[in-house]
Amino acid sequence: MNCKKIIICIALGMAGFAMNLSATEPAAAIKSHKAVDAAAPNIYWTDANGQVSYNINDKTAHVVKIALNLFENDMKGVTGYAAKQKNTAPIQIFQLDQLSNKEFSNLEKLGAPVQKIITTKDAYFIGVRKKKLIVVGSNARGTAYAILELSKMAGVSPWSDWYDLKPQPRKSIFTPVDQQWIGIPRIEFRGLALNGSKWMNPQNYSRIARLMLRLKYNTLWQVDGKHDVIYNKAVVDSFDICIAENYRVTEWTGKKHKKKHRKTLENVKMVCDNAEMPIENVAPGLVLDMLNNKDYLETKSERREKSHRHEAHNDEDCAWIANVTNPKKAPLQLAMMSDLAWNPYALKAGIRNYLQSWLNNLFGSVVGKKIQPLMEEYYRLTSIRQPAYMAMPYGDTEFHSGEFGNELERFLYNYDLLKTKTVNIEKTLPADQRDGFFEIVKYPIFSAALIAEKE
């Protein structure tokens, strides 16, 4: 079975704040406001002591157990108590492809829209039915994604393992009865190509796999084309991750690494953030060359020299792969790519609103509102001249000190002003948010400013 396209995100810059993205209707991730239980306004996850409880079907995949363990620890960070399993729990979790006849019958009696997700890989449903919060996944990954969506609803960031981000303490957690979510991926294979990752060890790969689980990514691209036994055992088996190698995606299962199924990926498409470099297909050899040997985008003249270009097809994309050296360098971009892979209307309200929402999820609405102008200005300045290009003769991009009202001085002044605003806002933050603020906001801003001053 052939998949016609794979998107390789060579650059994940945020130069597009001037873009006007809009859409007409929601898709993939659906939030319904139809009342399903008028007797109770909210379904509380917590008991009188503030402890969250859940119940799950008897037979589940290993990745679901990993997600449950993460969820239990997440709830401890929010309520002070780890979530526990309990038969009469308000949260009822089901992995569709592992249900017994009795369990499936019980799920049908609850009225969950099983038919909407049962035939789609990685899909899930979360909603209130008969005074219970029902969580259903079509397969192992879908169930794990749904469980970790609960963590996000409770205020736990997917990046909590990578940054010093502590969720806001809560005595109770609840879901209104008139809300439900159906997650159906638009892109079948969503993942990362870890470029220059030979320094990684199994512990770091496991950490990346946890992040992928929280971001709902399911694929790792083998840039070096080599399988490592420890890598496969720790990541592929445990986290149910697909491996893309030599333009083939393989899903593995079991300790003996038996092949489950395999798909061939053709017509590799590259997505760039530079307006001068339009989206177009390039041959696999070129992309592999870029993945292995370069950490920057080719110039327009370099691209013109390539003779193996061809017309893009109009069929559906089957894979989106983000080429990164370290996922920690692009948290917003990776989150945005994941959201768009699940819902093409994720940016319906515009990029500025998306940025605001993302910061609110990390720091809360009060602090997020303060930070948003800083990050918007940071992305604007780095799009004018990206820090990675400062020491490179990247075309005619040098600043002029005597022309255009001294654009060099104005560029550096804007960085100085941004640094001052950053320090002033940092002073107003509570102590438990300053470490996360430093990692996500202050460090990138000051680093970019220092590089600009140096060059």
Which residue ranges define each predicted feature?
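Bacterial N-terminal signal peptides that target proteins for export
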Residues: 1-10
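Bacterial N-terminal signal peptides
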Residues: 9-18
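Contiguous, structured surface segment used for ligand recognition
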Residues: 23-184
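Aromatic-lined carbohydrate-binding surfaces of glycoside hydrolases
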Residues: 52, 57-60, 64, 79-89, ...
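Extracytoplasmic/secreted proteins, especially bacterial periplasmic and envelope-associated proteins
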Residues: 63-66, 70, 74, 142-145, ...
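Internal mixed beta-strand/loop scaffold within catalytic domains of large alpha/beta enzymes
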Residues: 123-128, 137, 141-164, 172, ...
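Substrate-binding groove of N-acetylhexosamine-processing glycoside hydrolases
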Residues: 178, 266, 273, 277, ...
